[in-house]
Amino acid sequence: MVLIKLNIIMAFMLALTGVLIYRSHLMSTLLCLEGMMLSLFIFMAAVITHFHMFSISMMPLILLVFSACEAGVGLALLVTISNTYGNDQVQNLNLLQW
């Protein structure tokens, strides 16, 4: 179980460094955020099954629902930015302010 937790934490850290490194493009940032959410989902499911905490067994599913909503909003923002400006640079987000 320790090796599984270590691999999941390493996947989360790898996705976090991807967010920090590839923050100039919105698509790369969204993909790294999805990797972070999936590693959190796997970690929560593994901890719940390991410690037999079945009273909170819906929490990973709720996390997946919020992750899907976040991905939908992010992709809608990506389509809007790419249609307006022709690229997915994050610097264009400052231009959307009123």
Swiss-Prot record:
- What is the membrane topology here? Multi-pass membrane protein
Q: Which GO terms describe its biological process?
A: ATP synthesis coupled electron transport
Q: Tell me one GO molecular function of this protein.
A: NADH dehydrogenase (ubiquinone) activity
Which GO CC annotations does the UniProt entry carry?
mitochondrial inner membrane; respiratory chain complex I
Reactions the enzyme catalyzes = a ubiquinone + NADH + 5 H(+)(in) = a ubiquinol + NAD(+) + 4 H(+)(out)
Disulfide pattern? none
The UniProt record lists the EC number as 7.1.1.2
Enumerate the subcellular locations listed in this protein's record, separating them with semicolons: Mitochondrion inner membrane
Q: Which EC class is the enzyme in? A: translocase
KW Mitochondrion (keyword) present: yes
- Membrane-traversing stretches: 1-21, 36-56, 61-81
What is the protein's major site of localization?
mitochondrion
Tell me the subunit arrangement. Answer: Core subunit of respiratory chain NADH dehydrogenase (Complex I) which is composed of 45 different subunits.
Family from the record: Belongs to the complex I subunit 4L family.
Relate the protein's function as given in its record: Core subunit of the mitochondrial membrane respiratory chain NADH dehydrogenase (Complex I) which catalyzes electron transfer from NADH through the respiratory chain, using ubiquinone as an electron acceptor. Part of the enzyme membrane arm which is embedded in the lipid bilayer and involved in proton translocation.
**Protein name in the entry:** NADH-ubiquinone oxidoreductase chain 4L
What gene, per UniProt, encodes this protein? MT-ND4L
